[in-house]
Design a protein with these regions (language model features):
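Short acidic, Gly/Ser-rich segments with clustered Asp/Glu that frequently serve as metal-coordination loops
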Residues: 15-17
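Helical "lid/coupling" subdomains associated with nucleotide-phosphate turnover
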Residues: 1-7, 21-164
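Conserved catalytic-loop position in the HRD/HxD motif
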Residues: 9-13
Length: 164
C-alpha cells in the first residue's frame, strides 16, 4: 500500500495566513490587507513596492520549507483563491484545480497592470488586497513546490436570478 500523501490547507486572511499541515496550524505574518498596507503605497503597487513585498513574502514562506513533505497536496476553501482560479480561466465548480502555471499567468497579468496597463484591460481587480493575495499564493506555491491547489467549497451561484 502506498503511503498517504501529506495534506496542506491554505487560508490567506486579511491579517495573517494560516497553513494547516496534517492538522497542525502554523501562522505566517502575511495577510492580504496586512501586506498591501505595509508595502503598497500606490494603487496599483509600483514595481519597486511589489519587489520589496516579494522579498518579504518569500522570506516568511521560507520558514515552512522543511515542514512540508514532498508530494504534499495543497487545498483551500478561500473565496479569494476561488476568484483567482476563475480569473485564471478555471471553470466554476465545487472543486476547482488551479495550477501553478495558471497562477503565474495571472501574476503576469498583474505585472502588466503594475507597469501601466489598465486593470480593466486584463480583466483583474485593481485593488491592492487582490494584488497581495495573488502574490502570497504565487510565492507559496512556487517556493514550496506545489504544482496545483485544489479549491473546495460551494459552487458560486448567482443570487436573485430571474425565474424561468
Amino acid at each position: 500500500m502506498a503511503p498517504a500523501l501529506s495534506t496542506v490547507f491554505l487560508h490567506i486572511g486579511s491579517e495573517d495566513t494560516q497553513v494547516t499541515l496534517d492538522g497542525t496550524i502554523q501562522r505566517l505574518t502575511l495577510g492580504s490587507q496586512l501586506t498591501s498596507l505595509a508595502y503598497f503605497r500606490h494603487q496599483p503597487p509600483a514595481p519597486a513596492e511589489m519587489e520589496t513585498a516579494i522579498m518579504v513574502v518569500e522570506d516568511e514562506i521560507a520558514r515552512l520549507r522543511h515542514d512540508i513533505a514532498p508530494g504534499a497536496r495543497l487545498y483551500s476553501e478561500d473565496n479569494d483563491i476561488r476568484a483567482i482560479a476563475r480569473l485564471a480561466g478555471v471553470a466554476e465548480n465545487e472543486e476547482m484545480s488551479l495550477s501553478v502555471e495558471a497562477v503565474e499567468r495571472t501574476f503576469d497579468r498583474l505585472a502588466l497592470v503594475i507597469n501601466g496597463r489598465p486593470a480593466s484591460f486584463e480583466g483583474i481587480p485593481d485593488g491592492n488586497d487582490f494584488a497581495a493575495t495573488l502574490l502570497i499564493l504565487r510565492e507559496f506555491m512556487h517556493h514550496l513546490q506545489f504544482n496545483e491547489i485544489v479549491i473546495k467549497g460551494a459552487k458560486f451561484e448567482m443570487l436573485n436570478q430571474p425565474s424561468r
